[in-house]
């Protein structure tokens, strides 16, 4: 199937959509751009009327708070940013609530940190909450809980949060609204002739550092993070549509076939929801370095055995999420380690038959089982 046919079929059949909108779309120099917000809400109401469930991931709290506080307070450092978020979040939600109310739609606020999705029990609670809200035909409005999040509990940006929610709500489409017209084939800041790519066939094959100038250059929430989120969505089998968020009715025009944006195709071989959760529920706490033979075995679908390990980095415990890297430093996979780092250092390079003599009875033959590993993880 060609991508145009795929896109048309998905847009016609989509029944659950995660829409992400960032601060660059929602705000102007004077704070919240109410015209943009009103148009966004009107488009979501239109989709709602067609029977499409929508989860809205919305940034803008910090920017809205800054607009209120700038006359009296200087905002600098993380505590001030978190305080500005507290001021802005209530104003942002108040406006959303009124805007959706004008269309007869109930909105609901959900604030999350990584810790809320790290525990399988809390992950399932979150899933049930979203399901109940959508059964009531409400629109969940999600943001990272900036006020309480610390570095190790941050999603990093709302693009990452939105990609993880695809798995929570079983979405069949991811729409990412940006201040650009879509994804450019080259950096438009340095190449004025750069054009928007209407389709990305293989998002994993893109060199993001070249296209986006690297993560540092574009900053949190730039095109770099949007394409990383699209990579995760593609692994889950969910296509991504990147659209110009400040352009009036861009989503409705896209559903009508009149607004191209950039369509990111999903992978043909997708990962299970469980593996997706295992790989992305937490940040890796260490690394296991493997030889070329082990890399080939993993690519063939095998588990990682201690014999293929040539190095261990970090001080993680049993069951921790770790990176699997090649000798050259490339990330091959992430997975849950059957052994703490100290034990892995003792058994690395040894054959399975030797493990009992080194560590005692009842040892796992695998350092990381293939069922607990995700290849080509986006970390």
Swiss-Prot record:
Subcellular localization(s) per the UniProt record: Cytoplasm
Residues annotated for ATP binding in this entry: 20, 220-226
Pfam families registered for this protein in UniProt: AA_kinase, PUA
InterPro entries, alphabetized: AceGlu_kinase-like_sf, Asp/Glu/Uridylate_kinase, G5K_ProB, Glu/AcGlu_kinase, Glu_5kinase, Glu_5kinase/COase_Synthase, Glutamate_5-kinase_CS, PUA
Domain PUA: 285-362
Gene Ontology terms: biological process: L-proline biosynthetic process
Positions of substrate binding: 59, 146, 158
Alphabetic keyword roster: Amino-acid biosynthesis, ATP-binding, Cytoplasm, Kinase, Nucleotide-binding, Proline biosynthesis, Transferase
UniProt GO molecular function: ATP binding; glutamate 5-kinase activity; RNA binding
Keyword ATP-binding included in the entry's annotation: yes
EC number(s) given by UniProt: 2.7.2.11
Record field: transmembrane: none
Highest taxon of source: Bacteria
Pathway assignment: Amino-acid biosynthesis; L-proline biosynthesis; L-glutamate 5-semialdehyde from L-glutamate: step 1/2
Gene Ontology annotations for the cellular component aspect, listed alphabetically: cytosol
Enzyme class: transferase
Catalytic activity: L-glutamate + ATP = L-glutamyl 5-phosphate + ADP
Role: Catalyzes the transfer of a phosphate group to glutamate to form L-glutamate 5-phosphate.
Family the entry assigns: Belongs to the glutamate 5-kinase family.
Protein name per UniProt: Glutamate 5-kinase
Species of the source: Oleidesulfovibrio alaskensis (strain ATCC BAA-1058 / DSM 17464 / G20) (Desulfovibrio alaskensis)
